[in-house]
C-alpha cells in the first residue's frame, strides 16, 4: 500500500490529530479510521465518468504513535472498479496540503 506516515507521535499529538480528523473527516467503520473526501474538481477522468461510484475518498488510520494516510483513492459504493486507483499528482498534492494543515493547526512537532 502506498501511504504517507507521520510517526513518533506523542500520545497528546496523536489525540490532537484524532480530534482534528473527527471534526474534519467522515468516520470510518472502526475506531481510528477516517475518510477524507476528495473534491470533485481533482477527480481523475475515469472517476468523473463513474459518478455512481462516488464520492471518492482516501483512508486515514490513527495508530498508537502514528497516523497513516493512504494514497489509494477508494469508491464509497464499489470495492472493485477501474475508477479505484492510486492518487494522481493533483490528488497527492491535495492530501499533502491536508496533512500540512493538520500538523500546523495542531502544532505537531513529530
Which residues does each predicted region cover?
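Residues in well-ordered beta-strands of folded domains
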Residues: 7, 35-37, 61, 70
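Short, intrinsically disordered, mixed-charge
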Residues: 19-27, 101-108
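Hydrophobic transmembrane signal anchors and adjacent membrane-proximal interface regions, especially
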Residues: 3-7, 48, 96
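C-terminal basic regulatory modules in eukaryotic proteins
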Residues: 54-110
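Short, surface-exposed beta-strand/loop "edge" segments at domain boundaries and coil↔beta transitions
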Residues: 12-15, 43-45, 76-80
Amino acid at each position: 500500500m502506498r501511504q504517507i506516515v507521520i510517526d513518533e507521535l506523542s500520545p497528546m499529538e496523536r489525540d490532537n490529530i484524532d480530534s482534528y480528523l473527527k471534526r474534519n473527516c467522515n468516520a470510518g467503520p472502526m475506531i481510528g479510521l477516517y475518510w477524507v473526501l476528495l473534491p470533485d474538481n481533482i477527480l481523475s477522468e475515469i472517476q468523473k465518468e463513474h459518478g455512481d461510484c462516488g464520492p471518492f475518498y482516501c483512508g486515514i488510520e490513527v495508530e498508537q504513535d502514528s497516523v497513516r494516510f493512504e494514497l489509494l483513492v477508494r469508491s464509497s459504493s464499489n470495492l472493485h472498479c477501474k475508477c479505484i486507483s492510486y492518487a494522481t499528482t493533483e490528488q497527492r498534492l491535495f492530501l499533502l496540503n491536508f496533512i500540512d494543515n493538520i500538523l500546523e493547526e495542531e502544532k505537531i512537532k513529530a
